[in-house]
């Protein structure tokens, strides 16, 4: 009986790898279409959109074409030979792509769940606000950091090989290969990034491909690193699997046989590593010598080249010393500085005064880049002098105040942990004067007249959430001494994202 139960569980676990029968279910495409409507944000009624674009007859025709398709390369091409029904032609290709995405997302979620359960608390899906306290706790104990930009110029066959690890049915792989080759222009460096950022029709599919690719990188790299560092506390002779582990390193890094020695393996004995990623940017914090950092860089380069058969440009991995240089990540300049502390220790009748030097993370907000962005959006000129936002003069007074309020609150909450908060209050001054000038331009008056008419409402309604945030969290004196990492941050700030792209272009050039 127990053997029969094990066979049933094994058969049930293998059923999730066979995905091709799901493409012949009509309700799957209805679910995919509902997800598309929820993400589109269109102002048209839902009934009108469904009656205009969605048709179960078109779905049945698409399913029939999938069954009878011989030349799979043209599957997304001529979906409907009737040139008078253009919407059905577009819906055919969209429905196949969205249905494929829904099926793969469900299977990927089941696979990632089992992977996370076996990783002792490792979770690659966390909120962005967890990154800032992690960096504040871990980076001061590191002396080197590796800034990695994950390559996103992916060949379709690499993605097919990734999906072959957990998809067992051949028809699904053939369908996926035909779609990937048909959409291979979307996997280039610029187009894939554009597809992820913009709300295009292939955004969901591109995001899924990107997440699958990064998940495959982390699912192989993170367990290997954890296993290596967990083995450092054991003796070489009492570790029976050490020989097998050396063979893995030899296979991945492609060491010559004469270079594999106990001395080279034990270089990382007393070091530790911390890994964090957001989007395509990853940080690996290390504590060790410069030689160890160079070895990790060498290992990572060979990991991508031999495991994914993908050329990894050397400029995509930069090794920086935190105490001497700055690293840009998530819109911050990251730097570790020494902080002296005076400790008084009393022993019996003697009082000792000891000076201790500790490392402290010093995150800095890019104030000049924020001013450049505000000048680009016509809130101020190049020199930082506030000007009126002429495109907002047609709005009501409440809408103008609310828009300026949201801009400042987003900036203040995101950069609340920076050390140069004085620069943020300079940004606040620019936004306040720009708001007053916009209202004055709308009413064809001056700033003094607007201030007299609105009174304190101009400065109480606008930027009011900042005072609520400060008063509910810390006092003013404590605010000057400590940083506040806001837990309401769900994504990177648009200004920080714009600045980070500028930094990436400078690195490439």
Curated annotation (Swiss-Prot):
GO cellular component: chloroplast
Key word Chaperone present: no
InterPro entries per the UniProt record, alphabetical: Domain_X, Maturase_MatK, Maturase_MatK_N
Domain of life, per lineage: Eukaryota
Compartments in which it is found: Plastid, Chloroplast
UniProt keywords, alphabetically: Chloroplast, mRNA processing, Plastid, RNA-binding, tRNA processing
GO molecular function, one term: RNA binding
Pfam families for the chain: Intron_maturas2, MatK_N
Biological process terms in GO annotation: mRNA processing; RNA splicing; tRNA processing
Major place of residence: plastid
Record has Plastid as a keyword: yes
HAMAP family: MatK
Stated role: Usually encoded in the trnK tRNA gene intron. Probably assists in splicing its own and other chloroplast group II introns.
Entry protein name: Maturase K
Species this protein is from: Sequoia sempervirens (California redwood)
